[in-house]
């Protein structure tokens, strides 16, 4: 449902773009929503180039200052890294909703100044957790007890510790974006 919602946002808002950043270990799409002002989208490739240049250790301090004045801040927000911590993915939905539906001065300033990358960090674990919880038809019979099996195909709950090795497809997908 999160993926369908993000797709819809990407289709209907001039402030959002939905993209698939790769496949997960179990073959699901891992998606990202890019959120910024409509004006920033006109120069998005330029801002990407500036960000890549700023990430280069060979530039001088003066070049870095000049580039930072020309670019936009990039903010990464992921959710759902640990599948049993379900609020993580839900905050992405709420944050996207707030940024895309509000037209107050503060929201407009954020969207003008920042490019926000919002990613579901663990679609496989989320699907497993959801199926486990919803296995009982009657809500009163549903259990919040932990899953009786290892989740996150190769790393278990420790998928956040994979960011230095990048063994998992999910970590690799995220690494390519950063």
Model-derived segments and their meaning:
Residues 2-39:
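A non-catalytic alpha/beta surface segment that caps or lines the substrate-entry region
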């Amino acid at each position: 449902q999160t993926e369908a919602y993000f797709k819809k946002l990407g289709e209907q808002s001039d402030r959002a773009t939905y993209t698939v950043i790769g496949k997960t270990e179990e073959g699901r799409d891992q998606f990202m929503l890019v959120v910024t002002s409509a004006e920033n989208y006109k120069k998005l490739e330029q801002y990407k180039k500036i960000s890549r240049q700023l990430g280069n250790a060979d530039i001088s301090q003066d070049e870095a200052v000049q580039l930072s004045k020309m670019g936009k801040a990039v903010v990464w927000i992921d959710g759902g890294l640990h599948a049993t911590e379900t609020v993580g993915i839900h905050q992405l939905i709420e944050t996207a909703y707030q940024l895309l539906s509000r037209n107050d001065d503060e929201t407009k300033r954020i969207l003008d100044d920042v490019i926000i990358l919002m990613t579901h960090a663990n679609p496989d674990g989320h699907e497993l957790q959801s199926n486990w919880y919803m296995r009982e038809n009657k809500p009163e019979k549903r259990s919040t007890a932990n899953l009786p099996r290892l989740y996150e195909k190769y790393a278990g709950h420790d998928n956040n510790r994979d960011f230095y090795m990048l063994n998992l497809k999910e970590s690799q997908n995220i690494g390519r974006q950063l």
